[in-house]
Amino acid sequence: MNEYLLDANVLVRFLVQDDAKQSAAATALFEKADRREIALHLDGLAVAEAVYVLIGRYGLARSDVANVLLAIVQNAGVETAEAGMVADALQRFAAANVDFADAWLAARAAVIGHPVASFDRDFDKFKDIRRFEPKT
C-alpha cells in the first residue's frame, strides 16, 4: 500500500474546492484513503498551516475551520501524528480567542503537565494548564 504525508495545500484544496483540477485530485486522494487503498499521514504542522490559510486567505470562521479539520483528524483513513493533541488544540482554538500556535502549546502543556513560560495572557483562558511569566 502506498503511503503519503499530507501537505496543507492538499487539505485546503479538498476543503474549499476552489481549483477544479487540484480539488478533484485532493478529493480522489481522500476517497482512496477512505477505501483503504492508500494511507494518508497528517502532521500537526500541516494542520497549523491549513488553519492559517483557511482563516487568513479564505476568511472562514475559526469554529468552521476547527470543525472541518477535526473531522479530517478523526477520519479513519487518515493517520494523524499525535491525533489526540491535535484534536485538543483544534477544540481549544475553536473555543477560545487564541491563535492556533497558542492552542497547540496549551494542548501540549496539558499532556506533559508543565506550565507554559509566556508573557501572553491568552494562556490564562485555559483552566487546565498554568502559565509561568518570566521575571528578572
Question: What are these model-derived regions, one by one?
Answer:
Residues 7, 102, 120:
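Acidic active-site catalytic centers that drive phospho-/nucleotidyl reactions
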Residues 51-55, 70-73, 90:
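Amphipathic alpha-helical segments within well-ordered protein domains
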